[in-house]
Amino acid sequence: MAPKNSSWNPFDDEKEAAKSFSLNPFDDDDDDKEVEKRFTSSLKPSGGKENQTVQELESYAVYNSEETTKTVQGCLKVAEEIRCDASKTLVMLNEQGDQITRTHQKTVDLDHHLSRGEKILGRLGGVFSRTWKPKKSRSITGPVITKGDSPKRKVIDLKTREKLGLNPSLKPKSKTLPEAVDAYQKTQIAKQDEALTDLSALLGELKNMAVDMGTAIERQTNELDHLQDNADELNYRVKQSNQRARYLLRK
């Protein structure tokens, strides 16, 4: 059976075609639902897509193309918001690392002053008193600065990016567009390709930022462990010095 309006060619006049079935991708959600309902309801009673006219099928294809474009652009927007939050997190991690380093440096200064006090306490007690020396289980060292320790973003090696599918050099397979696709749909596809390219680049950037976060957290965890050891040692030595001072005061 020949479809209705078989003499009508949707590709003769792009303006007329756009007027017939062009949809605004920025319409309200209610309008989108109404359009989708109209498309799906028109397919069921007539026996599916096989029995639709060329104009109806073309209109439905344009609708799906616009929906795909909006979905891809929505994903891109979410990725941009994640990147913004990740950037703030990286800044906070760098500031936290600086605070840990400054605190660690203070333990070195405290060790220097404590050593001077221990020497003075050791000399006190009279001529016949035995020289007192504090017990030290470990030396106090400052923050360890490793090579390549930089807040700058590190670049993931090529193999890792290829495994993740984030290598910008990997181009998607070219798709041959059927001749039936009009200029409007080609415009939508171009928008989708552009958004997908930006999304791919964003995902690669987010992966780099995630690696940087993991590296910073691991480094700071090791620094905190080292700082804890120094703090425990200083606490032990301060207790010894206080005991020595109380002993001298009782004499």
Curated annotation (Swiss-Prot):
Protein's cellular compartments: Membrane; Cytoplasm
Gene Ontology cellular-component terms listed: SNARE complex
Chain ranges of the t-SNARE coiled-coil homology domain: 186-248
CDD domains the UniProt entry points to: SNARE_SNAP25N_23N_29N_SEC9N (cd15861)
Principal location listed in the UniProt entry: membrane
Cited SMART domains: t_SNARE
Ranges of Polar residues composition bias in the record: 40-52
Top-level taxon in the UniProt lineage: Eukaryota
Family note: Belongs to the SNAP-25 family.
PANTHER family: SNAP25 HOMOLOGOUS PROTEIN SNAP29, SYNAPTOSOMAL ASSOCIATED PROTEIN
Protein name: SNAP25 homologous protein SNAP29
